[in-house]
């Protein structure tokens, strides 16, 4: 995508006046790849496409060591403490009072016969189709073609090495002289989530809770290698862009608000250095979401799988002091759904373990999307739950699920969602020595260690933009974010321009619940009496990707783009143009957007 010459300004203006939007998409989006990273999924596609490929952000690697865990996050702490259990029951009762259903202890003692219940069978056509689908275990083998002369001509050492690497004692029964069955070295996407725990694979999630999943058991180098492998596989298998062709492609990287400077730099190195793109630009999800829905000013509420964020955007510029990061998302709603069913003894006596068997999380996510909604009154349905035992076909169990309107209320009562606690990353991961010009060396890092603080609380990112999670509900986060925006006229506009994006934003009844809860959360001293959630013009889970595509296509100046050779040689340096002469921050160089 060549940069226009300085004397072609008028021709560009004439071009924009006459060209059709579809023509701009096809002409400028054909060699522009948009990459939107998330904790659970990564969305990748050409800017001219209607939708991206939505692929689970994980990789399963073949392992030879016996006794090694099948999931790298095996060390996650999911034990609920006594205090957390008390807080969870209290949060349940608060939600029950709002939904006009029986409290937790009342429900368990009085039974379900006397309840006034509503029944659901899937609230939309897509959910009705998905609710009865069954997952199958991934075939971890592949055929290895062998020449008929290979037994006599191949050296014994070479044959032994290849056999010990990934070839099990499984042969093709049809023609053993021409092919063998061997383990696949790497498996990506949903296939990786459906590998049986008995198979010799370890599952890696390079991004967790909105950050690189760096821990003593998962090095930063391996995280970057896995991200590179996942993106490379998508580019090759889904978009069919070879390594040689990528020198003529450009990338728009849409990153979560949770990413810090070092993670952004690592992504630029992966995209430009390892994936061979010609140039790249970085935009944050909040800004991309505004453009994805064709607005300029809005409060963006992004409810992801593991993290939710709130940020306000005014006239195409994100307001850093309005940013809120909440450590829960759609997967926590799934786990809450499982807890409630087990509490009421509605869940079959099967081994459902969302950590050891990610396939169980896929099943719970289907149940959540099909049946969970926010509405008053008892809500039950008959559903088919499947048990997935190691290597065995799925076994169906019909059961009566109850209190299906409570799990999504965890967005407003976060104590209802007890999130996993992740291992602490190494201390040196937080310290980016290339940011000395930001005076971070002169800031208090909290003394020695974390002093028992949460994972990201003690990390000083920059004086104006701390990356700190807040343990408040969604309504309080939205209200606090907008009230931090400043002018009263801007606040009124933002309260009337709330956008819900992300997969969990599809929950039926969530829009009305957000409007009601936010209105009640506004202090009486504020002269604001209107709260409105705007309908999304694009599928909520793809809004940020679509916005990244629009930003990339409309950026005719391309002054904010970083070229491959420039990044590999110079790395982070202040821009040479006037707009960047005082900018030492990576955000100022890589995230700057120029209106055409």
Swiss-Prot record:
Transmembrane intervals? none
Q: Where is this region: Disordered?
A: 148-178
Q: Name one Pfam family in it.
A: Actin
Give the record's family classification: Belongs to the actin family. ARP8 subfamily.
> What protein does this entry describe?
Actin-related protein 9
| Organism, as annotated | Arabidopsis thaliana (Mouse-ear cress)
State the encoding gene.
ARP9
């Amino acid at each position: 995508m060549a940069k226009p010459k300085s004397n072609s300004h008028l021709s560009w203006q004439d071009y924009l006046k006459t060209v059709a939007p579809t023509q701009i998409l096809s002409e400028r989006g054909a060699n522009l790849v948009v990459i939107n990273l998330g904790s659970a999924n990564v969305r990748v596609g050409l800017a001219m496409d209607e939708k991206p490929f939505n692929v689970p952000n994980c990789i399963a690697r073949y392992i030879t060591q016996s006794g090694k865990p099948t999931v790298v996050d095996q060390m996650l702490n999911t034990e609920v403490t006594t205090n957390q259990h008390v807080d969870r029951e209290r949060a349940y009762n608060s939600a029950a009072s709002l939904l006009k259903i029986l409290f937790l202890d009342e429900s368990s003692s009085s039974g379900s016969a006397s309840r006034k219940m509503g029944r659901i069978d899937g609230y939309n056509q897509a959910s009705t189709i998905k609710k009865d689908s069954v997952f199958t275990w991934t075939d971890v083998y592949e055929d290895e073609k062998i020449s008929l002369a290979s037994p006599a001509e191949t050296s014994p050492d070479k044959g032994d090495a290849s056999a010990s690497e990934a070839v099990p004692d499984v042969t093709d029964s049809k023609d053993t002289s021409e092919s063998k069955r061997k383990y696949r070295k790497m498996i990506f996407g949903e296939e990786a989530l459906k590998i049986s725990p008995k198979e010799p694979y370890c599952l890696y999630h390079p991004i967790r809770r909105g950050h690189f999943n760096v821990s003593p058991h998962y090095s930063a180098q391996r995280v970057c290698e896995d991200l590179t492998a996942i993106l490379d596989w998508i580019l090759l298998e889904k978009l069919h862009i070879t390594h040689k062709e990528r020198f003529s492609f450009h990338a728009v990287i849409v990153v979560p608000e949770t990413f810090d400077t070092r993670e952004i730099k690592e992504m630029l190195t992966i995209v430009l250095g390892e994936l061979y793109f010609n140039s790249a630009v970085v935009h944050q999800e909040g800004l991309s979401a505004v453009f994805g829905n064709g607005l300029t000013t809005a409060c963006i509420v992004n409810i992801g799988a593991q993290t939710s964020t709130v940020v306000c955007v005014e006239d195409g510029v994100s307001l850093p002091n309005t940013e809120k990061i909440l450590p829960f998302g759609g997967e926590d709603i799934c786990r809450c759904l499982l807890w409630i069913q087990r509490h009421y003894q509605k869940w079959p006596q099967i081994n459902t373990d969302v950590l050891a068997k990610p396939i169980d999380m896929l099943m719970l996510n289907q149940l959540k999307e099909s049946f969970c909604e926010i509405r008053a009154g008892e809500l039950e349905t008959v559903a088919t739950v499947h048990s997935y035992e190691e290597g065995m076909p799925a076994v169906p169990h019909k059961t009566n699920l109850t209190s299906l309107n409570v799990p999504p209320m965890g967005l407003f009562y976060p104590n209802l969602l007890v999130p996993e606690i992740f291992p602490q990353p190494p201390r040196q991961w937080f310290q980016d020595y290339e940011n000395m010009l930001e005076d971070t060396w002169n800031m208090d890092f909290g003394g020695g260690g974390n002093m028992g603080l949460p994972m990201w609380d003690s990390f000083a990112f920059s004086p104006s933009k701390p990356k700190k999670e807040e343990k408040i509900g969604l309504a309080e986060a939205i209200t606090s974010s907008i009230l931090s925006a400043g002018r009263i006229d801007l606040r009124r506009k933002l309260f009337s321009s709330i956008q819900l994006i992300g997969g969990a934003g599809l929950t039926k009844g969530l829009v009305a619940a957000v409007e009601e809860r936010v209105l009640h959360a506004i202090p009486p001293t504020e002269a604001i009496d209107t709260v409105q959630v705007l309908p999304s013009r694009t599928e909520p889970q793809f809004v940020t990707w679509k916005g990244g595509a629009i930003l990339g296509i409309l950026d005719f100046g391309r002054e904010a783009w970083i070229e491959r050779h420039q990044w590999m040689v110079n790395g982070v340096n202040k821009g040479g143009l006037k707009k960047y002469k005082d900018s030492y921050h990576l955000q100022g160089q890589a995230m700057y957007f120029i209106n055409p």
